[in-house]
């Protein structure tokens, strides 16, 4: 019983300690939550105060920077530039960095395409010709560098000769001139996009309902989506701030190079737009939208301009509303305007800039001609005639003088220039016949450039003809060397065949020697067998001789004994003694022969 009570007491103490620890943890966590909430509230108040100061300063700058009505035509561009710089808001650092990195390759490609469109067609044609010609020597130099080196001095000398022959000096100079003229023509055009203007002097809004723009789709919760393309402060696009995926798709009046957009919210009892995203496309409906930029608007009830870092050609825009200021129930948007340049305006701007360039060239040519006339008046008539001949030759030879000459002839004819006539009207648009006249003048300039190209190509053909002749001579020398190498290779092949034949003969001789050696070994074995037989016979003969010798010795001893003892007994019988004597003599004779 006592043990059970002690266990219950211990359990109660443990449960009390755990509950006390939990209560302390909850108290600490609640205090931290309240502290963090207070810090967040103070930071939001400070941010809203800073945004309000920025909005006031921006409003003051806009009110001070409004131009007068009398100077609208002269100062409209400067005021728009200052207003764009003052009211344009940069995107968030994280989003902008990602967007800039993602659009770096596309911006480079679009800039190169715009440069090629703005450059004169004559320069483009010449540039293509020069680039196609430059590729040949570069490929030749690469092939020469990849060849197997023999002697260092010979290879370096041949490479230098080939480079000097393949790259004439005139080609590089012409290419540098073309690139310089291209840079000069692009210096005033690529820096910025000049917006299309209306006849009244205002910027042309491609997202206006009066121009034909439409709102194609929006999210289900949105109401009054078509109000943002009508400039009416009492109408607006309304969305509950709690909804996600708020968007609006707008069809522009024309296919446009969009450069700037303007948004505004004039409704006081609503939350202002903060972060938004702009997408574009040329075809609708589509699954792939081109990202144009992410922006952050100020918390203010005024119009705000946003300029794209990389303008692109689009027909449909999609506005994604990402976040908002404040804590109102509705998020509204009163205005959306789009500014840029359409394809026709872009082409006319290029033509006007090219025409200005030609006028400057004509003025420079006139000044040079006046200076030359004053210098010629001081000199004698004979020198004047000689110099005039030389100048005519130089003008016929140089392509730039030919172009200036043709332009001066066009000026003397005093053809009407539709570009100059309509350039003084900034808000007007050229009719179709004036565009055709401009295109005809463009075709004439292209004809002049083609004649220049023909003369240049003739000179290049002569130079390259000489180079090709030298290359033919070198090729003939190389062919002779190749023929000698072929003969040497054939001799080497014959020698190889002879060595193969000798090797075959050596193999046959070796086979013969091997067969003879085999025969000799067989005979040797036979001789060994015969010698063994002879040795065996000799051994047998020796044994036989020993046996005969022993027998003869035995019979000899018997005969001696018989003769010695029988002489006294058998004296009377003479015939018996003679037989033993003969036996003794024959045995001694045999022993003597065997002893030899």
UniProtKB/Swiss-Prot annotation:
Q: Name one GO cellular component term.
A: nuclear membrane
Provide the protein's localization. Answer: Nucleus membrane; Endoplasmic reticulum membrane
Describe the disruption phenotype: No visible phenotype. Embryo lethal when associated with disruption mutants SUN3 and SUN5.
Keywords, in A-Z order? Coiled coil, Endoplasmic reticulum, Membrane, Nucleus, Transmembrane, Transmembrane helix
Keyword Membrane included in the entry's annotation: yes
Q: Where is the composition biased (Polar residues)?
A: 80-95, 141-158
Subunit? Forms homomers and heteromers with SUN3. Interacts with SUN1, SUN2 and TIK.
What is the source species? Arabidopsis thaliana
Bias (Acidic residues)? 66-77
Instruction: Provide the residue span(s) of the region labelled Disordered.
Output: 58-98, 139-158, 366-410
Q: What does this protein do?
A: Encodes a member of the mid-SUN subfamily of SUN-domain proteins that is localized to both the nuclear envelope and the ER. It is involved in early seed development and nuclear morphology. [TAIR].
Q: What residues does the SUN domain cover?
A: 179-343
Which residues, by range, are in coiled-coil regions?
A: 475-544
Protein name, per record = SUN domain-containing protein 4
Which ranges does the record mark as transmembrane?
28-48, 545-565, 576-596
What main location does UniProt list? nucleus
Give the source's domain of life in one word: Eukaryota
Quote the biased-composition stretches of kind Basic and acidic residues, using this chain's numbering.
366-396
Q: Name one GO biological process term.
A: nucleus organization
* Membrane topology value: Multi-pass membrane protein
